[in-house]
Amino acid sequence: MKIYVDADACPVKDVIIFEATKAEIPVTLVTSFSHYSNAEQPIGVETIYVDSGADAADYRIMQLAQKEDLIITQDYGLASLALAKGCIVLHHKGYKYTNDNIEQLLQTRYLSAMVRKSGKRTKGPKPFTAEDKEKFRALFKSFIVR
């Protein structure tokens, strides 16, 4: 198993790196050049930089990921593609994407886009909390400690 992180706006990178390093599982952070950092990463953690295009990180993750790899993303489109490839996909708020819930998530995203297109406003996501972070940590550990 390898871990791929859609890292541009991922608030749990520290949890992923800490827990995966402890379990000796390789992590690849995929992020745009606009988030470039000289920060040194622990052994087993690689950062791949991609162009700042809308889905560049998603495409790169899909090129790299194999069946049963673990993907962390908040992007429903990437989650859908990764599920179809046989990957395990987690959201940073601590839930697992499944074939049962992805259709509903994509439908909700589409309907919200249509509402915005008509000139109306929609609610954004709730703020990320410490409770969300711990929920993610527990779920993440359940997949890497086997």
From Swiss-Prot:
Highest taxon listed in the record's lineage: Bacteria
Disulfide bonds: none
InterPro entries for this protein: UPF0178
A Pfam family per the record: DUF188
Residue ranges of the TM segments: none
PANTHER family, per the entry: UPF0178 PROTEIN YAII
Family: Belongs to the UPF0178 family.
HAMAP family given in the database record: UPF0178 (MF_00489)
Protein name: UPF0178 protein BCQ_2874
Source species: Bacillus cereus (strain Q1)
Lineage: Bacteria, Bacillati, Bacillota, Bacilli, Bacillales
